[in-house]
Amino acid sequence: MKDKIVRATAKDGMVRIIAGITTNLVNEGCKIHECTPVASAALGRMLTAGTLIGTTLKSEKEVVTLKINGNGEINGITVTAHSDASVKGFIGNPYVDRPLNEKGKLDVGGAIGTDGILYVIKDLGLRDPYIGQVPIQTGEIAEDFAYYFTASEQTPSAVSLGVLVDRDLSIKAAGGFIVQMMPGADELLADVITYRLEEIPPITTLISEGKTIEEILEYIFDGMDLKVLDSLTPEYKCDCSRERVEKALISIGKETLQEIYDDKKNEEIVCNFCNTKYEFTNDEIGELLNNSR
Protein backbone atom coordinates (compact mmCIF):
# COMPACT_ATOMS: atom_id res chain seq x y z
CA MET A 1 0.00 0.00 0.00
CA LYS A 2 1.27 3.48 -0.91
CA ASP A 3 1.94 6.03 1.80
CA LYS A 4 -0.60 8.83 1.98
CA ILE A 5 -1.38 11.87 4.13
CA VAL A 6 -4.90 13.36 4.15
CA ARG A 7 -6.22 16.56 5.63
CA ALA A 8 -9.86 16.52 6.65
CA THR A 9 -12.54 18.11 8.81
CA ALA A 10 -15.59 16.82 10.65
CA LYS A 11 -18.67 18.35 12.26
CA ASP A 12 -18.78 21.46 10.05
CA GLY A 13 -15.12 22.25 10.57
CA MET A 14 -15.21 21.99 14.35
CA VAL A 15 -12.75 19.10 14.15
CA ARG A 16 -9.48 19.30 12.19
CA ILE A 17 -7.79 16.05 11.19
CA ILE A 18 -4.39 15.24 9.71
CA ALA A 19 -3.84 11.52 9.22
CA GLY A 20 -1.62 9.24 7.24
CA ILE A 21 -0.08 5.91 6.40
CA THR A 22 3.72 6.20 6.52
CA THR A 23 4.91 2.59 6.29
CA ASN A 24 7.30 3.01 3.35
CA LEU A 25 8.66 6.32 4.60
CA VAL A 26 9.43 4.88 8.05
CA ASN A 27 10.93 1.73 6.54
CA GLU A 28 13.30 3.85 4.45
CA GLY A 29 14.42 5.95 7.42
CA CYS A 30 14.93 2.96 9.71
CA LYS A 31 16.86 1.09 7.01
CA ILE A 32 19.20 4.05 6.49
CA HIS A 33 19.97 4.24 10.21
CA GLU A 34 20.10 0.44 10.72
CA CYS A 35 17.72 0.66 13.67
CA THR A 36 16.92 -1.99 16.25
CA PRO A 37 13.17 -2.67 16.77
CA VAL A 38 12.75 -0.19 19.64
CA ALA A 39 14.80 2.46 17.80
CA SER A 40 12.64 1.88 14.69
CA ALA A 41 9.48 2.40 16.73
CA ALA A 42 10.83 5.63 18.21
CA LEU A 43 12.26 7.07 14.99
CA GLY A 44 9.17 5.98 13.05
CA ARG A 45 6.83 7.77 15.43
CA MET A 46 8.89 10.96 15.18
CA LEU A 47 9.04 10.75 11.38
CA THR A 48 5.28 10.27 11.23
CA ALA A 49 4.72 13.22 13.57
CA GLY A 50 7.05 15.27 11.40
CA THR A 51 5.29 14.59 8.13
CA LEU A 52 1.87 15.24 9.69
CA ILE A 53 2.92 18.53 11.31
CA GLY A 54 4.84 19.53 8.19
CA THR A 55 1.62 19.63 6.17
CA THR A 56 0.37 22.47 8.39
CA LEU A 57 3.09 24.78 7.05
CA LYS A 58 1.86 27.45 4.64
CA SER A 59 4.67 27.54 2.06
CA GLU A 60 7.46 25.39 0.66
CA LYS A 61 10.06 27.71 2.20
CA GLU A 62 8.86 27.02 5.74
CA VAL A 63 10.45 24.23 7.78
CA VAL A 64 9.52 22.53 11.03
CA THR A 65 12.09 20.73 13.18
CA LEU A 66 11.04 18.38 15.97
CA LYS A 67 13.48 17.33 18.68
CA ILE A 68 12.89 14.99 21.59
CA ASN A 69 15.83 14.93 23.99
CA GLY A 70 15.29 12.64 26.95
CA ASN A 71 17.64 10.92 29.36
CA GLY A 72 17.24 7.49 27.75
CA GLU A 73 19.72 5.45 25.75
CA ILE A 74 18.47 6.71 22.37
CA ASN A 75 20.24 10.04 23.02
CA GLY A 76 17.62 12.11 21.24
CA ILE A 77 15.86 12.18 17.88
CA THR A 78 15.68 15.11 15.45
CA VAL A 79 13.26 15.30 12.53
CA THR A 80 12.91 18.01 9.88
CA ALA A 81 9.80 18.29 7.69
CA HIS A 82 8.38 20.46 4.91
CA SER A 83 4.94 21.44 3.65
CA ASP A 84 5.07 18.82 0.87
CA ALA A 85 5.11 16.04 3.53
CA SER A 86 8.78 15.24 2.94
CA VAL A 87 10.75 14.45 6.08
CA LYS A 88 14.18 13.34 7.26
CA GLY A 89 15.41 12.22 10.65
CA PHE A 90 18.44 11.52 12.82
CA ILE A 91 18.60 9.25 15.86
CA GLY A 92 21.42 9.50 18.39
CA ASN A 93 21.71 5.77 19.12
CA PRO A 94 19.96 3.51 16.58
CA TYR A 95 21.41 0.39 18.20
CA VAL A 96 19.64 0.68 21.56
CA ASP A 97 18.12 -2.57 22.83
CA ARG A 98 15.67 -2.84 25.71
CA PRO A 99 13.37 -5.53 27.09
CA LEU A 100 9.65 -5.21 26.34
CA ASN A 101 7.66 -3.02 28.72
CA GLU A 102 5.04 -4.28 31.18
CA LYS A 103 2.42 -4.31 28.39
CA GLY A 104 4.60 -6.56 26.22
CA LYS A 105 5.30 -3.70 23.81
CA LEU A 106 8.51 -2.11 22.57
CA ASP A 107 9.69 0.18 25.37
CA VAL A 108 9.90 3.46 23.46
CA GLY A 109 9.28 5.51 26.60
CA GLY A 110 12.19 3.85 28.38
CA ALA A 111 14.47 4.28 25.37
CA ILE A 112 13.60 7.98 25.02
CA GLY A 113 13.50 8.72 28.75
CA THR A 114 11.04 10.90 30.63
CA ASP A 115 13.49 13.50 31.93
CA GLY A 116 13.92 15.93 29.05
CA ILE A 117 12.31 18.32 26.59
CA LEU A 118 10.24 18.08 23.40
CA TYR A 119 10.99 20.97 21.03
CA VAL A 120 8.94 22.17 18.05
CA ILE A 121 10.89 24.72 16.01
CA LYS A 122 9.14 26.43 13.09
CA ASP A 123 11.20 28.46 10.63
CA LEU A 124 8.53 30.58 8.95
CA GLY A 125 10.93 32.82 7.06
CA LEU A 126 10.83 35.52 9.73
CA ARG A 127 13.86 36.95 11.52
CA ASP A 128 13.61 34.47 14.38
CA PRO A 129 12.10 30.97 14.35
CA TYR A 130 9.16 30.06 16.58
CA ILE A 131 10.36 27.72 19.33
CA GLY A 132 7.86 25.82 21.46
CA GLN A 133 8.98 23.43 24.16
CA VAL A 134 7.38 21.25 26.82
CA PRO A 135 8.69 18.71 29.31
CA ILE A 136 8.54 15.12 28.09
CA GLN A 137 5.49 13.44 29.64
CA THR A 138 5.88 9.73 28.90
CA GLY A 139 8.54 9.41 26.20
CA GLU A 140 6.04 7.44 24.13
CA ILE A 141 6.00 10.44 21.73
CA ALA A 142 2.28 10.58 20.80
CA GLU A 143 1.28 11.60 24.33
CA ASP A 144 4.12 14.12 24.37
CA PHE A 145 2.88 15.82 21.20
CA ALA A 146 -0.70 15.82 22.50
CA TYR A 147 0.57 17.64 25.60
CA TYR A 148 2.57 20.05 23.44
CA PHE A 149 -0.45 21.06 21.33
CA THR A 150 -2.61 21.58 24.41
CA ALA A 151 -0.03 23.36 26.59
CA SER A 152 2.01 25.32 24.04
CA GLU A 153 -0.46 26.00 21.20
CA GLN A 154 -3.63 25.96 23.33
CA THR A 155 -5.28 23.49 20.94
CA PRO A 156 -6.80 20.40 22.61
CA SER A 157 -5.53 17.49 20.52
CA ALA A 158 -5.53 13.73 20.34
CA VAL A 159 -2.42 12.21 18.77
CA SER A 160 -1.85 8.61 17.71
CA LEU A 161 1.47 7.40 16.27
CA GLY A 162 2.16 3.75 15.57
CA VAL A 163 4.96 1.60 14.14
CA LEU A 164 4.74 -2.17 13.76
CA VAL A 165 8.14 -3.81 13.29
CA ASP A 166 8.22 -7.19 11.50
CA ARG A 167 10.44 -10.13 12.46
CA ASP A 168 12.93 -9.30 9.71
CA LEU A 169 13.20 -5.75 11.16
CA SER A 170 11.32 -4.24 8.22
CA ILE A 171 8.35 -2.00 8.98
CA LYS A 172 5.08 -3.90 8.59
CA ALA A 173 2.86 -0.88 9.23
CA ALA A 174 3.25 2.74 10.33
CA GLY A 175 0.93 5.70 10.52
CA GLY A 176 -0.81 8.16 12.75
CA PHE A 177 -3.21 11.02 13.12
CA ILE A 178 -3.64 14.36 14.85
CA VAL A 179 -7.22 15.28 15.77
CA GLN A 180 -7.77 18.84 17.00
CA MET A 181 -10.84 20.57 18.39
CA MET A 182 -11.35 24.05 16.98
CA PRO A 183 -12.43 27.02 19.15
CA GLY A 184 -16.15 26.83 19.90
CA ALA A 185 -16.39 23.05 19.58
CA ASP A 186 -18.90 21.33 21.88
CA GLU A 187 -17.30 19.62 24.88
CA LEU A 188 -19.65 16.67 24.41
CA LEU A 189 -18.30 16.26 20.86
CA ALA A 190 -14.77 16.10 22.26
CA ASP A 191 -15.88 13.43 24.74
CA VAL A 192 -17.49 11.33 21.99
CA ILE A 193 -14.38 11.52 19.79
CA THR A 194 -12.13 10.67 22.75
CA TYR A 195 -14.28 7.61 23.48
CA ARG A 196 -14.13 6.44 19.87
CA LEU A 197 -10.37 6.89 19.70
CA GLU A 198 -9.96 4.83 22.86
CA GLU A 199 -12.15 2.04 21.50
CA ILE A 200 -10.62 1.57 18.04
CA PRO A 201 -7.81 -0.95 17.43
CA PRO A 202 -4.26 0.45 17.09
CA ILE A 203 -3.79 2.27 13.80
CA THR A 204 -1.05 -0.19 12.81
CA THR A 205 -3.56 -3.05 13.18
CA LEU A 206 -5.99 -1.30 10.84
CA ILE A 207 -3.20 -0.57 8.33
CA SER A 208 -2.02 -4.20 8.51
CA GLU A 209 -5.57 -5.31 7.69
CA GLY A 210 -5.31 -3.34 4.45
CA LYS A 211 -7.55 -0.42 5.37
CA THR A 212 -6.88 2.87 3.60
CA ILE A 213 -6.44 6.04 5.61
CA GLU A 214 -9.82 7.26 4.35
CA GLU A 215 -11.49 4.06 5.57
CA ILE A 216 -9.84 4.44 8.96
CA LEU A 217 -11.13 8.01 9.29
CA GLU A 218 -14.63 7.01 8.15
CA TYR A 219 -14.57 4.32 10.83
CA ILE A 220 -13.61 6.83 13.54
CA PHE A 221 -15.80 9.73 12.41
CA ASP A 222 -18.86 7.81 11.25
CA GLY A 223 -21.91 10.10 11.28
CA MET A 224 -19.81 13.23 11.85
CA ASP A 225 -19.88 14.67 8.32
CA LEU A 226 -16.26 13.77 7.54
CA LYS A 227 -14.84 15.79 4.64
CA VAL A 228 -11.45 14.93 3.13
CA LEU A 229 -9.95 18.19 1.86
CA ASP A 230 -6.80 17.02 0.09
CA SER A 231 -4.01 14.48 0.13
CA LEU A 232 -0.22 14.35 -0.17
CA THR A 233 2.37 11.62 -0.68
CA PRO A 234 4.88 11.62 2.18
CA GLU A 235 8.46 10.53 1.59
CA TYR A 236 11.78 10.25 3.37
CA LYS A 237 13.86 12.85 1.56
CA CYS A 238 17.22 14.33 2.49
CA ASP A 239 18.18 17.64 0.88
CA CYS A 240 21.91 17.39 1.54
CA SER A 241 24.33 18.17 -1.30
CA ARG A 242 28.04 18.65 -1.85
CA GLU A 243 27.49 22.40 -2.09
CA ARG A 244 25.79 22.50 1.32
CA VAL A 245 28.57 20.42 2.86
CA GLU A 246 31.16 22.82 1.41
CA LYS A 247 29.32 25.75 3.02
CA ALA A 248 29.22 23.86 6.32
CA LEU A 249 32.98 23.27 6.15
CA ILE A 250 33.63 26.94 5.47
CA SER A 251 31.35 27.89 8.37
CA ILE A 252 33.51 26.04 10.93
CA GLY A 253 36.04 28.87 10.69
CA LYS A 254 39.39 29.49 9.04
CA GLU A 255 41.49 28.23 11.95
CA THR A 256 39.77 24.84 12.11
CA LEU A 257 39.79 24.53 8.32
CA GLN A 258 43.51 25.41 8.31
CA GLU A 259 44.17 22.63 10.85
CA ILE A 260 42.34 20.14 8.63
CA TYR A 261 44.37 21.28 5.61
CA ASP A 262 47.67 21.11 7.53
CA ASP A 263 47.00 17.45 8.38
CA LYS A 264 47.58 16.73 4.66
CA LYS A 265 44.80 14.14 4.68
CA ASN A 266 41.58 13.69 2.76
CA GLU A 267 38.40 14.49 4.68
CA GLU A 268 35.17 12.45 4.67
CA ILE A 269 31.91 14.08 5.77
CA VAL A 270 28.89 11.85 6.41
CA CYS A 271 25.34 13.27 6.40
CA ASN A 272 23.60 12.48 9.69
CA PHE A 273 20.21 12.15 7.99
CA CYS A 274 20.91 9.87 5.02
CA ASN A 275 24.48 8.57 5.59
CA THR A 276 25.66 9.88 2.21
CA LYS A 277 29.46 10.23 2.25
CA TYR A 278 31.18 13.30 0.79
CA GLU A 279 34.93 12.96 0.10
CA PHE A 280 37.22 16.00 -0.01
CA THR A 281 40.86 15.77 -1.09
CA ASN A 282 43.45 17.87 0.70
CA ASP A 283 43.66 20.11 -2.38
CA GLU A 284 39.88 20.66 -2.27
CA ILE A 285 40.14 21.58 1.42
CA GLY A 286 42.80 24.10 0.39
CA GLU A 287 40.44 25.62 -2.19
CA LEU A 288 37.71 25.97 0.44
CA LEU A 289 40.24 27.62 2.74
CA ASN A 290 41.13 30.15 0.03
CA ASN A 291 37.45 30.83 -0.65
CA SER A 292 36.83 31.53 3.04
CA ARG A 293 39.38 34.34 3.15
Swiss-Prot record:
Name the GO cellular-component terms.
cytoplasm
Q: How does it get modified after it is made?
A: Under oxidizing conditions two disulfide bonds are formed involving the reactive cysteines. Under reducing conditions zinc is bound to the reactive cysteines and the protein is inactive.
Q: Where in the cell is it found?
A: Cytoplasm
Does Cell inner membrane appear among the keywords? no
Any single Pfam family the record assigns to this protein: HSP33
Disulfide cross-links: 238-240, 271-274
Molecular function as annotated in GO: protein folding chaperone; unfolded protein binding
Top-rank taxon, per record:
Bacteria
List keywords of the entry alphabetically.
Chaperone, Cytoplasm, Disulfide bond, Redox-active center, Zinc
Q: What's an example GO BP annotation here?
A: protein refolding
List the InterPro entries hit by this protein, alphabetically: Heat_shock_Hsp33, Heat_shock_Hsp33_C, Heat_shock_Hsp33_N
Which Gene3D superfamilies does UniProt cross-reference here? Answer: Hsp33 domain (3.55.30.10), HSP33 redox switch-like (3.90.1280.10)
Q: Does the keyword Disulfide bond apply?
A: yes
Per the record, the similarity remark reads: Belongs to the HSP33 family.
UniProt-listed PANTHER family: 33 KDA CHAPERONIN
> What is this protein's function?
Redox regulated molecular chaperone. Protects both thermally unfolding and oxidatively damaged proteins from irreversible aggregation. Plays an important role in the bacterial defense system toward oxidative stress.
Identify this protein by name. Answer: 33 kDa chaperonin
Organism from which the protein derives: Clostridium beijerinckii (strain ATCC 51743 / NCIMB 8052) (Clostridium acetobutylicum)
Give the lineage.
Answer: Bacteria, Bacillati, Bacillota, Clostridia, Eubacteriales
This protein's gene is called hslO
